[in-house]
């Protein structure tokens, strides 16, 4: 099995998907995973989480791909959320080894970065994504996707747009969680469901949205996402059942759709 990963990074999260041929573990102990610290929140590195996820089965990554609607005009809040979701989609496309989709996502990242004024930051990386995808160099593509989003985050912070950087991270987390729940739902196990047990991380995002300036916090899309996170919270603060996985998938799917359409 190819070793691969999905990333949705920036200030808050790197989501990685990795696979390799080993026997499934008898039990997943998240407390033993390598961890990363996000302010006061310590969470398992998602790359390790997805190493375990792939041990539990062989996901159909091509089947998890979607066709996002790229809107490079509109409110910066929507564009920032969409940028994170698109990069998360890029790593799904890498998992599927879909050259055409990865190349299109590279162009989409550039278009969205242009819309929020940080095009020059990612130009060389997006060109590299397209070139390396054509060559089938997936390790390099993942590295460039990771770097592109990190560069965007740093540029936003330099421009005093840290709030937008949080939204980029959140957009990636939402799309990544939608994919994760879809995969777990198709082959449910308690160990797989345990990977969704991230209450501190969810609280982190809720607090970032609550602390935004009123003009952003009261944005229709941000309000919708805040409500969605509030719905997810009780579902991951208890034993995660097949019903909980299904409901989290529905909620995150609705939020990702709202990001695409601003519905």
Task: Please place each PLM-identified region on the residue numbering.
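Secondary-structure edge/capping motif, primarily at the C-terminal ends of alpha-helices
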Residues: 90-97, 116, 120, 155-159, ...
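Non-transmembrane, amphipathic alpha-helical segments
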Residues: 71, 75-82, 90-97, 101, ...
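Bacterial N-terminal signal peptides that target proteins for export
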Residues: 1-8
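A cross-kingdom marker for long, charged
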Residues: 214-263
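Bacterial N-terminal signal peptides
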Residues: 9-18
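Short, charged, amphipathic alpha-helical segments
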Residues: 103-107, 127-128, 167-170, 192-199, ...
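Extended amphipathic alpha-helical interaction segments
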Residues: 132-215
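N-terminal Sec/ER secretory leader and immediately downstream segment
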Residues: 23-129
């Amino acid at each position: 099995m190819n070793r691969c990963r999905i990333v949705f990074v920036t200030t808050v999260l790197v989501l990685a998907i990795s696979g390799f041929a080993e026997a499934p573990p008898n039990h997943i102990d998240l407390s033993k995973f390598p961890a990363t610290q996000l302010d006061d929140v310590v969470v398992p590195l998602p790359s390790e989480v997805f190493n375990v996820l792939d041990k539990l089965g062989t996901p159909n990554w091509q089947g998890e791909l979607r066709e996002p609607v790229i809107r490079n005009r509109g409110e910066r809040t929507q564009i920032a959320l969409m940028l994170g979701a698109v990069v998360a989609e890029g790593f799904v496309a890498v998992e599927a080894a879909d050259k055409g989709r990865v190349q299109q996502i590279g162009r989409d990242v550039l278009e969205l970065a242009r819309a929020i004024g940080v095009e020059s930051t990612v130009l060389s990386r997006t060109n590299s994504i397209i070139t390396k995808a054509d060559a089938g160099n997936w390790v390099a593509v993942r590295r460039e996707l990771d770097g592109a989003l990190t560069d965007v985050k740093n540029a936003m912070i330099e421009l005093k747009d840290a709030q937008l950087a949080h939204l980029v991270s959140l957009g990636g987390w939402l799309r990544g969680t939608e994919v994760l729940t879809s995969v777990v739902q198709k082959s449910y196990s308690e160990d797989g469901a345990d990977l969704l047990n991230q209450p501190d991380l969810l609280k982190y995002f809720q607090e970032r949205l609550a602390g935004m300036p009123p003009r952003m916090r009261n944005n229709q899309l941000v309000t919708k996402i805040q409500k969605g996170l509030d719905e997810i919270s009780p579902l991951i603060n208890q034993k995660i059942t097949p019903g909980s996985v299904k409901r989290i998938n529905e909620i995150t799917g609705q939020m990702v759709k709202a990001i695409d359409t601003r519905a």
